[in-house]
Amino acid sequence: MYAIAFDLEIAELKKHYGEPYNGAYLEIGKELKAIGFEWTQGSVYLSNDNNLATVYRAISTLSKIDWFKSSVRDIRAFKVEDWSDFTAIVKGA
């Protein structure tokens, strides 16, 4: 599986997207979900498959959103080989 992680500059996001700016994150989530990514935490999304073409489609889609292009500080994609969820252990469940 692959992951996409990004960081948006809030001041730029407010300027180019508007208020409430957190709606931008919902829009990004919808776009990525349609391509095959699931939100994990923060601004990290995991693909449902092991295909770099899915990553390419996601990056291509995001690059067509003007307010995203103007607001993104950093965006990276990487391969995830092992993914372990320790939430239940930390919460004592």
UniProtKB/Swiss-Prot annotation:
Enzyme class: hydrolase
Subunit description: Homodimer.
Name of the molecule in the record: Endoribonuclease VapD
E.C. designation(s): 3.1.-.-
Secretion signal span: none
Role played: Cleaves ssRNA, mostly between U:A.
InterPro entries: VapD (IPR016368), Virulence_VapD/CRISPR_Cas2 (IPR019199)
Keywords: Hydrolase, Nuclease, Virulence
UniProt KW Coiled coil keyword: no
Entry similarity comment: Belongs to the VapD ribonuclease family.
Organism name: Dichelobacter nodosus
An example molecular function term from Gene Ontology annotations: nuclease activity
Domain of life, source organism: Bacteria
Cross-referenced Pfam families: CRISPR_Cas2
Keyword Transferase attributed: no
